Amino acid sequence: MARKDTNKQYSLRKLKTGTASVAVAVAVLGAGFANQTTVKANSKNPVPVKKEAKLSEAELHDKIKNLEEEKAELFEKLDKVEEEHKKVEEEHKKDHEKLEKKSEDVERHYLRQLDQEYKEQQERQKNLEELERQSQREVEKRYQEQLQKQQQLEKEKQISEASRKSLRRDLEASRAAKKDLEAEHQKLKEEKQISEASRKSLRRDLEASRAAKKDLEAEHQKLKEEKQISEASRQGLSRDLEASRAAKKDLEAEHQKLKEEKQISEASRQGLSRDLEASREAKKKVEADLAEANSKLQALEKLNKELEEGKKLSEKEKAELQAKLEAEAKALKEQLAKQAEELAKLKGNQTPNAKVAPQANRSRSAMTQQKRTLPSTGETANPFFTAAAATVMVSAGMLALKRKEEN
């Protein structure tokens, strides 16, 4: 209700203001016409008066026109106010309908709130009017202040221009320093990349060196073990060679005895049948010994060749072993040549000699009793082939083959 009364009062005030403006305009027009009439009556020179009247009439027409425009604007405002008033009434009606649905306490509270808002609105209106008056005073004051500020700004502008030039010089110097720093940074970055690549390369080289060191240590240990095996094999072979030489000497002595017995059997020519059998058996044994000696010789030559290809023996050891093997091979060749000659003689001198047969049997039994044993294995010595010699040769051959594969 309070809002509705307020809107009505506002509309009436606007209407009164518009009516008063029209009244003022009419009064001005009446005064203008009255002045025009007075001027015409009192003037002795009608022409100037007419000009003045025309000028006044034009001014009046302009004023009337302006007043009519203001009047039209006022009516438009009045229409707008009425429309707003209608809207407010509709809103108020809606609010009223809503309020009717609520309790009386809420309605009283709402009305009190509306009244409070109206009072606050009135207070704000007063404050606004006071603020307008203050604003006028402040406008004048600010104008003066603005003039002072303008002068101050001119001074500050000059100072700012000088400062701007100085800042520009500083900025250019800073940009140049920045470029130098960027170049230095890029250089340091490149040096860091080079250092990082070098560090990675050194690390790879170090790891490769460590791996190579481990491989060399393993190879060294392996070669050390192989050297020990080779040394043991060489010592065993040396002992077997010494035993073989001793057996060879015994065989030569026995062979000499057989030769003497053969001469005796050739002179006696008794026991042809038994001597012939003994001769054949001796022939078979000599042929078997010859074949065995050839096999031993080939094995020794092969071992000699493999030992020559070995890289882990010293030159002195190789020379000593080579000399021993060559001497042994030469002795075996001479022995084979002698046995071949004796075999040829046995083939050409097969004459009956019965009395000498027991002597031949005794000499063969003596040969059996005089066989020696090898010091390395304890086996019965054979001047041409032993199990220990075969083992040594096989071990040496395997060692040489393994070295070839590794190389």
From Swiss-Prot:
C repeats: 151-185, 186-220, 221-255, 256-290
Compositionally biased tracts (Polar residues): 360-380
Localization per record: Secreted, Cell wall
Record region (Disordered): 83-289, 344-382
Pfam families: Gram_pos_anchor, M, YSIRK_signal
GO annotation terms (biological process): phagocytosis
Propeptide: 378-407
Bias kind Basic and acidic residues: ranges: 83-144, 152-229, 237-264, 272-288
Membrane topology listed for this record: Peptidoglycan-anchor
Protein keywords: Cell wall, Coiled coil, Peptidoglycan-anchor, Phagocytosis, Repeat, Secreted, Signal, Virulence
Motif (LPXTG sorting signal) on chain: 374-378
InterPro entries the UniProt entry points to: LPXTG_anchor (IPR019931), M_anchor (IPR019950), M_repeat (IPR003345), SMCR (IPR049896), SMDRR (IPR049895), YSIRK_signal_dom (IPR005877)
Region feature 2 X 7 AA tandem repeats, mapped onto this chain: 81-94
Range of residues in the leader sequence: 1-41
D repeat start-end pairs: 323-328, 329-334, 337-342, 344-349
Sequence positions bearing Pentaglycyl murein peptidoglycan amidated threonine: 377
Cellular component GO terms, alphabetical: extracellular region
Coiled coil regions in record: none
Its biological purpose: This protein is one of the different antigenic serotypes of protein M. Protein M is closely associated with virulence of the bacterium and can render the organism resistant to phagocytosis.
Family, per entry: Belongs to the M protein family.
Full protein name: M protein, serotype 2.1
